A protein has these predicted regions:
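Fold-independent oxyanion-binding glycine-rich loops
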Residues: 19, 47, 59
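Active-site and channel-lining beta-strand-loop segments
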Residues: 34-54
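Short, flexible segments with low predicted structural confidence
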Residues: 15-16, 46-47, 70-71
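Glycine-rich loop-to-alpha-helix module at the N-terminal edge of alpha/beta enzyme cores
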Residues: 51-112
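Active-site-adjacent loop/helix segments that line or gate small-molecule/cofactor pockets in enzymes
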Residues: 1-38, 92, 98
Length: 112
């Protein structure tokens, strides 16, 4: 039994269906889901050491691939100020303005 199978057996005891999204359940495939440890570029690596080409891209947000250096650096820089405040921030205003300026049909933005 591989590490992914071991993790899945543990997960089903504490997480409904063993995964936090029905699409991750691999039900139609008839096998335990792969548990991913890391990713780089267009590749993901499971806890068993297998390498896969990532055609899922986290269902959209990883369009530039995983661990893209400029994005990683920007995230590290942003984290230095804190992660989540539960209050309004200047960068929210800047992001909303950027979106509205670049998508003329969008008048307002709400980020949740």
């Amino acid at each position: 039994m591989g590490r992914s199978e071991e993790l899945f057996e543990r997960a089903v005891k504490r997480i409904p269906g063993g995964v936090n999204s029905p699409v991750r359940a691999y039900g139609a495939i008839g096998m335990a889901p792969r548990f991913i440890k890391r990713a780089d570029g267009c590749h993901i690596y499971d806890v068993d050491g297998n390498e896969y080409v990532d055609y899922i891209d986290s269902w959209g947000p990883m369009i530039l691939g995983h661990n893209f250096p400029q994005i990683r650096e920007a995230v590290v820089e942003a984290c230095a100020d804190g992660l989540s405040f539960g209050c309004a921030t200047e960068i929210e205003v800047e992001m909303a303005e950027f979106i509205c300026e670049h998508l003329p049909h969008v008048e307002m933005v709400r980020m949740v």
